């Protein structure tokens, strides 16, 4: 009842002029932080996991957790495959109950990207599963995939329209200057490119690599058509640093129920800020 597709979430965001944050989780504690915070703020959120996360935690386990927590908090949640590349892997998870997919073939030439994505779209739409794909490629590291900055490239607005029409995707991830990971200095986002893409494509647009972006930049991208904001590294960093600090200050600590609380609190602050930046509080 409460586990939903991202399609309606993002269409609502597009109409409402806000964005839905997609938070990458890794285990029970990180999922608790996202769901509890979202429920308290009545904010729509997407629970995202890379292939590595699904391998680590188990697809069935993650689906069961999302379903149980959605019912517990009476809060709609979507579980989303982030940066998945293999058709068979996606198909297996869709058959298990996942209803939102990102097929990432952005590393392929344009025509091959279209072909790979369309194969996934044709399969997923049979199950009423929403599909996101990426045109252009971000630098940085996501899971085990490292893209050098020299190999990253921005989304071509005219190609974006052709790509969307040829594949039948439900949302489009764009490359406008963000990167996976944290930034050594503030990135210069190509807002004019984003505005141009918006003129060519009427789908909800997605921004990856949002960890560490300023509130001003996030809100400007939303004004120009971004409907989904992906955050991963910033959550991991906050959680990990708080845990390290606690264990340094309390070397005698051995109970995870105690020492994980500070990590959850630090991550909760990040989740709350991103929800505020996205303007989605009270929109669930």
UniProtKB/Swiss-Prot annotation:
KW Zinc (keyword) present: yes
Binding residue positions for dihydroxyacetone phosphate: 181, 209-211, 230-233
EC number in record: 4.1.2.40
GO molecular function, one term: zinc ion binding
Catalytic activity: D-tagatofuranose 1,6-bisphosphate = D-glyceraldehyde 3-phosphate + dihydroxyacetone phosphate
GO cellular component: cytosol
Family statement drawn from the similarity comment of this UniProt entry: Belongs to the class II fructose-bisphosphate aldolase family. TagBP aldolase GatY subfamily.
UniProt function note: Catalytic subunit of the tagatose-1,6-bisphosphate aldolase GatYZ, which catalyzes the reversible aldol condensation of dihydroxyacetone phosphate (DHAP or glycerone-phosphate) with glyceraldehyde 3-phosphate (G3P) to produce tagatose 1,6-bisphosphate (TBP). Requires GatZ subunit for full activity and stability. Is involved in the catabolism of galactitol.
Protein name as it appears in the record: D-tagatose-1,6-bisphosphate aldolase subunit GatY
Organism for this UniProt entry: Shigella boydii serotype 18 (strain CDC 3083-94 / BS512)
Organism lineage string: Bacteria, Pseudomonadati, Pseudomonadota, Gammaproteobacteria, Enterobacterales
Gene this chain is encoded by: gatY
């Amino acid at each position: 009842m409460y586990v939903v597709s991202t399609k309606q979430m993002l269409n609502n965001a597009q109409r409402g002029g806000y964005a839905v944050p997609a938070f990458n989780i890794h285990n029970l504690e990180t999922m608790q932080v996202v769901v509890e915070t979202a429920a308290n703020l009545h904010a729509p959120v997407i629970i995202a996991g890379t292939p590595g996360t699904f391998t680590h935690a188990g697809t069935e386990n993650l689906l069961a957790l999302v379903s149980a927590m959605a019912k517990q908090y009476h809060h709609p949640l979507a579980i989303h495959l982030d940066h998945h590349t293999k058709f068979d892997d996606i198909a297996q998870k869709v058959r298990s109950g996942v209803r939102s997919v990102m097929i990432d073939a952005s590393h392929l030439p344009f025509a091959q990207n279209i072909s790979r994505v369309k194969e996934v779209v044709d399969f997923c739409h049979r199950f009423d599963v929403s599909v996101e794909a990426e045109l252009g490629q971000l630098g940085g590291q996501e899971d085990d995939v490292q893209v050098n900055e020299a190999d990253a490239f921005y989304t071509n607005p005219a190609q974006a329209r052709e790509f969307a029409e040829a594949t039948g995707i439900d949302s489009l991830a764009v490359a406008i200057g963000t990167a996976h990971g944290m930034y050594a200095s503030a990135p210069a986002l190509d807002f004019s490119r984003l505005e141009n893409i918006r003129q060519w494509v009427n789908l909800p647009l997605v921004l990856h690599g949002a960890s560490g972006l300023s509130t001003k930049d996030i809100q400007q991208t939303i004004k120009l058509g971004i409907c989904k904001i992906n955050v991963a590294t910033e959550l991991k960093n906050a959680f990990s640093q708080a845990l390290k600090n606690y264990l340094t200050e309390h070397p005698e600590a051995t109970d995870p129920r105690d020492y994980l609380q500070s990590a959850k609190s630090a991550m909760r602050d990040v989740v709350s800020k991103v929800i505020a930046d996205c303007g989605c509080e009270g929109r669930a």
